[in-house]
Amino acid sequence: MILHHLLILLIINYCVATSPTNGYAPGPVSCPSSQLIRSGSQGINPNEQSYINARYPIAKQALSKFLHNANLQNFDVDSFLAHSNPTIGLAFSGGGYRAMLTGAGEISSLDSRTKTNTPVLAGILQASSYIAGLSGGSWLVGSLASNNLNSVDDMLSQGLWELTHSFLSYYGIEHPIKQVEEWVNVGNQVASKRNANFNVSLTDIYGRLLSYPLLTNTEDEGDAYLWSDVTSASNFQSHQMPFPILISDGRAPDTTIINLNSTVIELTPYEFGSWDPSLNEFVDTRYLGTKLDNGRPTGKCYNGFDNAGFFMGTSSALFNEAVLSITEANIPSFLKDIIDDILVDPILKSNIDVSAYNPNPFFKSSGSNTAISQSKNLYLVDGGEDGQNIPISPLLHRNVSAIFAFDNSNDVLNWPDGTSLVKTYERQFSSQGNGIAFPYVPDQYTFRNLNLTSKPTFFGCDAKNLTSLTKDIYDVPLVIYLANRPFTYWSNTSTFKLTYDDNERQGMISNGFEIATRSSGSLDDEWAACVGCAIIRREQERQGIEQTEQCKRCFENYCWDGTIYKGEPLGENFSDDGLTNSATEYNSNNVAGFNDGGTSILKKA
């Protein structure tokens, strides 16, 4: 029996640590005979499409169970699903640990494995085809996917997401020897990549430090764990997890990007690239680090560049600057030397927030004659830097019927105000947006004062109203928007708050659960049914099926009707369903963690 368990452990370790060096540095491998670059015009990656095709029957069965449990009135679930294929995508915004923890509560509300007495939305995670995250949302999606898509309950019980100390010093002053060992190990790991003749940036150090709380259960905190290794996880092999996508932005040094000109880079376990006209190409994730010329290797091929922590760090590279703060601590001198050596590079010194992806895999690519393909170097930044802080863009290319957009951004007083949706809406009219349609949304003032950030809101409820955006109106997803707000915890913590004790952590997670479930269903006993109505809406429209009276009632309550608010601001406090000037409902007397602004780690200019 002991031997049997040892064999299982060996198999697991083999599956989850495929870096050829068995460490952080990439290593040489045999080159494949196939082309490593492909055009985005070919559509979804064949491996991804095969995964989705195999997963969909599983997801559809879970959707059937959810819809049956949602108590939809006068609606035959089985008959509808026999002729319809609704597809769900989940998108988790950036926002540091605020976004990760609130998002954890939100995803736990969708998970049928969560232990709860109020399973209002349980099963939607199992019914989803895609899950995307950027910046703090990438910490959530990346750590879950890298841990076999464990439930949030299991992540906590297994000791992950231990945030009592900052990821900059995971063990803290209480364990000085272990803390120095961590810094020594991180320094050695990053040095090994540099010694293998790969450029390193602050993201390499930051990504390794970040892996301590996020990849705690992997060997050596994930120094050899690759993002492409997710495909070897048992829940991926059995098609039990939504397909995970992380997001970053491409940015040339010393330039500024906005929603209209950014190159949105997808980091999936299979591919790395962008649908945007500025690139429109993808490379096999496993072979990042290989020098390519027009998609063909010019020398040795490498695997191991796609370290999972490095990828999560890339998506959240805003936090690179945090690494500079540890140079003031008692860290080993050679780690300081590595940081100093990185900053000798004038590009990396003046662009602290970039991640170096050198060599550029798209160099001289025949399919793209843009600034990206003409440069030997590729630099990526935080996925939210262009203002699109919810990773909706990749889902718009994957023909989903409904998108759950979880917005835990910092727009006003560390609360979201809809800016991310506004930026994604505006982008469709730019050359980079390439006409990929997204539903109408209002301005930020309307978002707040029509209470669209205080209770869930649906956008794109009627496809017939989208004809001025696209002729393919049924291909535009309905967006289910849920913004961070207080119910049981004042969850507007600073993006740069890097420590949470167990009570704070649980407070944030629990509040996220309440956001998604509408206070455990207490504010609307038809909330599950209304979510079901939103999920099935596009397929109903495609088939000319009229909504039930219940669904019409739901849409009356939750759909934005096109109104733009011009009146006086309603206030900054929260009621159950909106903003208010009153301080009698959600305030310091009855909600824990009141206005915990956290501590900024960024140096003031």
Curated annotation (Swiss-Prot):
<dbReference type="GO" id="GO:0004623">
    <property type="term" value="F:phospholipase A2 activity"/>
</dbReference>
<keyword id="KW-0442">Lipid degradation</keyword>
<feature type="glycosylation site" description="N-linked (GlcNAc...) asparagine">
    <location>
        <position position="573"/>
    </location>
</feature>
<feature type="glycosylation site" description="N-linked (GlcNAc...) asparagine">
    <location>
        <position position="465"/>
    </location>
</feature>
<dbReference type="InterPro" id="IPR002642">
    <property type="entry name" value="LysoPLipase_cat_dom"/>
</dbReference>
<feature type="glycosylation site" description="N-linked (GlcNAc...) asparagine">
    <location>
        <position position="261"/>
    </location>
</feature>
<protein>
    <recommendedName>
        <fullName>Lysophospholipase 1</fullName>
        <ecNumber>3.1.1.5</ecNumber>
    </recommendedName>
</protein>
<comment type="function">
    <text>Catalyzes the release of fatty acids from lysophospholipids. Phospholipase B may well contribute to pathogenicity by abetting the fungus in damaging and traversing host cell membranes, processes which likely increase the rapidity of disseminated infection.</text>
</comment>
<dbReference type="Pfam" id="PF01735">
    <property type="entry name" value="PLA2_B"/>
</dbReference>
<dbReference type="GO" id="GO:0004622">
    <property type="term" value="F:lysophospholipase activity"/>
</dbReference>
<comment type="similarity">
    <text>Belongs to the lysophospholipase family.</text>
</comment>
<keyword id="KW-0325">Glycoprotein</keyword>
<feature type="glycosylation site" description="N-linked (GlcNAc...) asparagine">
    <location>
        <position position="399"/>
    </location>
</feature>
<dbReference type="GO" id="GO:0005829">
    <property type="term" value="C:cytosol"/>
</dbReference>
<feature type="domain" description="PLA2c">
    <location>
        <begin position="30"/>
        <end position="565"/>
    </location>
</feature>
<dbReference type="GO" id="GO:0044001">
    <property type="term" value="P:migration in host"/>
</dbReference>
<dbReference type="GO" id="GO:1903561">
    <property type="term" value="C:extracellular vesicle"/>
</dbReference>
<keyword id="KW-0732">Signal</keyword>
<keyword id="KW-0964">Secreted</keyword>
<keyword id="KW-0378">Hydrolase</keyword>
<dbReference type="GO" id="GO:0005576">
    <property type="term" value="C:extracellular region"/>
</dbReference>
<feature type="glycosylation site" description="N-linked (GlcNAc...) asparagine">
    <location>
        <position position="199"/>
    </location>
</feature>
<dbReference type="GO" id="GO:0005783">
    <property type="term" value="C:endoplasmic reticulum"/>
</dbReference>
<keyword id="KW-0443">Lipid metabolism</keyword>
<feature type="glycosylation site" description="N-linked (GlcNAc...) asparagine">
    <location>
        <position position="492"/>
    </location>
</feature>
<feature type="signal peptide">
    <location>
        <begin position="1"/>
        <end position="17"/>
    </location>
</feature>
<feature type="glycosylation site" description="N-linked (GlcNAc...) asparagine">
    <location>
        <position position="451"/>
    </location>
</feature>
<dbReference type="GO" id="GO:0046475">
    <property type="term" value="P:glycerophospholipid catabolic process"/>
</dbReference>
<dbReference type="GO" id="GO:0005886">
    <property type="term" value="C:plasma membrane"/>
</dbReference>
<dbReference type="InterPro" id="IPR016035">
    <property type="entry name" value="Acyl_Trfase/lysoPLipase"/>
</dbReference>
